[in-house]
Amino acid sequence: MPIVSGFKVGPIGFGLMGLTWKPKQTPDEEAFEVMNYALSQGSNYWDAGEFYGVDPPTSNLDLLARYFEKYPENANKVFLSVKGGLDFKTLVPDGNPDFVSKSVENVIAHLRGTKKLDLFQCARVDPNVPIETTMKTLKGFVDSGKISCVGLSEVSAETIKRAHAVVPIAAVEVEYSLFSRDIETNGIMDICRKLSIPIIAYSPFCRGLLTGRIKTVEDLKEFAKSFPFLEYLDRFSPDVFAKNLPFLQAVEQLAKKFGMTMPEFSLLFIMASGNGLVIPIPGSTSVSRTKSNLNALNKSLSPEQFKEAKEVLSKYPIYGLRYNEQLAGTLSV
């Protein structure tokens, strides 16, 4: 089992964003069922956010507090990672000590004493504040015992090195999927391997593109109706999607050849790339989909299959940015 800051976690984690960050959040009964199922299957690295809600922004944390109030016996079984450090209204990062401190304290307050905050990470790096300044602030919370450890999200390899020199970095969260493999070449995977820092892979299905449910432009438009923010992302533009269809079809063909679903293949590929370093955190709002995701652990990708997949997929260029031109500047800072 992977280890994050001395805590044994399952090889596939669980992202909670989709349970609350939408106009109508998942009812508690349904959310608790999914959370309990994930935990029962060993998926105990839970990824949450201080701002993962609409009304109020803290809905994700409030859901967790209600969950642990109902299931206090599960608090010590879960490793809880929470992202914060963003202005709720603008979602702009603020790495100043006062702002970061208030963010950590707000997360702790909303958990209402039901669960310790295991890992805190700023969701994005504030380019106007030296990373050392932000890390010194968070180190103070570790030293006081208010949080167990510190993580980083959407950072560059150089920032990881600088931050790690101030406080041990327990995990680095980045987007990583068959569509977004930047970390293999931009130094992030190399520095994390060198420093033995686990990589937490968010959006391992590229926000739905790798689930097997989106095969045509019509499918894309229908899918995006449930997630309005997708229309702002490059790869959900019908024109860009059409250019990426050959790649998607190649993924589907490889999955079938290897006796897997697209989600299973997508997870196993990035896990194999990390060679034990990568922990994907797919999200889900249903037990059936969570079960489907975790079924990847019942399959395996042989070294020969992994090599074949890399060779096949390298023939297809990927079109579109991970987000869009406006948001690109907030990534890998």
UniProtKB/Swiss-Prot annotation:
Keyword field: Cytoplasm, NADP, Oxidoreductase, Phosphoprotein
Superkingdom field: Eukaryota
InterPro entries named among the record's database cross-references: Aldo-Keto_reductase, NADP_OxRdtase_dom, NADP_OxRdtase_dom_sf
Catalytic activity: pyridoxine + NADP(+) = pyridoxal + NADPH + H(+)
Subcellular location: Cytoplasm
GO-annotated molecular function: aldo-keto reductase (NADPH) activity; oxidoreductase activity; pyridoxine:NADP 4-dehydrogenase activity
UniProt PTM comment: The N-terminus is blocked.
pH curve summary: Optimum pH is 6.5-7.5 for the reverse reaction.
UniProt keyword Oxidoreductase present: yes
Pfam family, one: Aldo_ket_red
Any one GO cellular component localisation term in the record: cytoplasm
Modified residues (Phosphoserine): S292
Enzyme's top EC category: oxidoreductase
Active site per UniProt: Y52 (proton donor)
A GO BP entry: vitamin B6 catabolic process
This protein's pathway: Cofactor degradation; B6 vitamer degradation; pyridoxal from pyridoxine (dehydrogenase route): step 1/1
Function noted in UniProt: Catalyzes the reduction of pyridoxal (PL) with NADPH and oxidation of pyridoxine (PN) with NADP(+).
Subunit relationships: Monomer.
Alphabetized PANTHER family for the sequence: AFLATOXIN B1 ALDEHYDE REDUCTASE (PTHR43625), PYRIDOXAL REDUCTASE-RELATED (PTHR43625:SF78)
Membership in a protein family: Belongs to the aldo/keto reductase family.
Protein name (database record): Pyridoxal reductase
Source organism of the structure: Schizosaccharomyces pombe (strain 972 / ATCC 24843) (Fission yeast)
